[in-house]
Structure formats: C-alpha cells, structure tokens
C-alpha cells in the first residue's frame, strides 16, 4: 500500500524537529489537524437531475490566528490531499510570519464540465455546508486549483 501524502508530510516534520528545539507538546499538537470536516454536496444540474459531490475543509492549526487556505476544485482531490495541503499552509504562514494558521478545502469535481450556473450552485452548496466554520475570525477560504473569479 502506498504511503499517504499526509503520512509523508508528518514524517518530514519529525525529521525537521530533530534539528530544531521544538517543544514536544507543540510537536504533538502538529501531528494532526485541529478540525477536518466532510460533506456531500447535493447540486441540481441544468438538466434537472441532482448530483452529489464530496467536499472537505481542514483547519489545521489556529495558534497564530484564523486559518486560511484555498478551496480546490479537482476530480482527484481527496481528504488526504486536503489535510496535507492544510498542514503545509500552516508552515507557509508561520515562515513568513503571517498571523494565520493553515487550512485547505476541496471538492471532488471536474469543474470544466460544469456550466456557469452549476458551478455557482456547487460553490453555494460548499459555503452552506461549511458556513458555521467560515468567517474572518475563524477560517478564511480563498481560490485554488480550477477555480476562477466567479467562484
């Protein structure tokens, strides 16, 4: 069985920690995301049918402030990728001293095959599903792979 991206990221953290003076409690906290959420987004398509899309939002760590990270629309996105990218976003914000923690979201969809109206309904369904977790003082979503200004 292949090693997950998230397992590889955690392994890099353990290796780096050996060369740094990191409090063991901090290292323990960084092993897993603070919060990972999943939803099935039901969207009415232009032809009247309904389709379900898997979606995720991972808030990795908010020690430095509200979490922030993009929402990826891609047919191969999965929970492992979302958690891994949220993990790395945590460190990217810390390295440049931004007052944010890391987060990432994803929807398993080939957005190129959706009409503008379907894409809008999908985006609204995502926000509705995760609305109680999103906000300027908690989690700040942003565009990512296969998104555009409309999304």
At which residue positions do the language-model features occur?
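N-terminal ligand-binding/catalytic initiation module
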Residues: 1-151
